[in-house]
């Protein structure tokens, strides 16, 4: 069942990128993120109500609540950076960089949570990273130090989006 859920997640994530790019064409990326956040919050609480789990919010302990709030802040930062990157760059360039969050999350899980990574998993990390780098123009990669210093480029925001998305996974797990 998890493979179906993960596949649907990938499908919706791809659709999200295209719809988000169209959405930021005529508004600021911050306003677009705010609107999206409201829609997600209403949908999530609606699902919690439909499944009868909304009352569980009162039984969350303090530590879990803290990490869920931190995870939520990381999610918000990721979304703000992602929409800023999409408003400045092409989906075909922003999305692969954003998906480096998978690599970052696995590395952070290894370092911070002690989760194991198999040889095949390590090979996958290398393959995902190499594939991502192949999808970015060489001149954009060579200009990365300048972009990071100056800020404001699509690449800077896409990298920040990936980092915050990885932190979302780690903080939600703790």
PLM regions with names:
Residues 10-14, 18, 45, 72-77, ...:
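Hydrophobic/small/kink-forming positions within alpha-helical transmembrane segments
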Residues 2-9, 48, 55-81, 150-163:
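Loop-to-transmembrane-helix transition segments
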Residues 25-32, 81-97, 174:
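Structural motif at transmembrane-helix junctions in multi-pass transporters
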Residues 1-8, 103-163:
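Juxtamembrane helix-loop boundary signature in multi-pass membrane transporters
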Residues 38-46, 97-111:
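Alpha-helical transmembrane segments of compact multi-pass small-molecule transporters, enriched
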């Amino acid at each position: 069942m998890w493979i179906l859920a993960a596949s649907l997640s990938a499908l919706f994530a791809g659709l999200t990128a295209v719809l988000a790019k169209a959405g930021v064409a005529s508004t600021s990326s911050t306003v677009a993120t705010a609107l999206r956040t409201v829609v997600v919050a209403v949908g999530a609480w609606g699902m919690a109500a439909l499944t009868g789990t909304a009352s569980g919010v009162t039984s969350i302990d303090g530590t879990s609540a803290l990490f869920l709030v931190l995870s939520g802040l990381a999610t918000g930062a990721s979304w703000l950076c992602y929409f800023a990157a999409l408003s400045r760059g092409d989906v075909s360039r922003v999305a692969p960089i954003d998906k480096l969050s998978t690599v970052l999350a696995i590395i952070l899980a290894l370092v911070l949570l002690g989760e194991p990574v198999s040889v095949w998993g390590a090979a996958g990390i290398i393959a995902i990273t190499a594939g991502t780098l192949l999808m970015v123009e060489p001149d954009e990669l060579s200009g990365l130090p300048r972009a990071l210093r100056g800020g404001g480029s699509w690449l800077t925001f896409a990298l920040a989006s990936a980092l915050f998305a990885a932190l979302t996974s780690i903080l939600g797990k703790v």
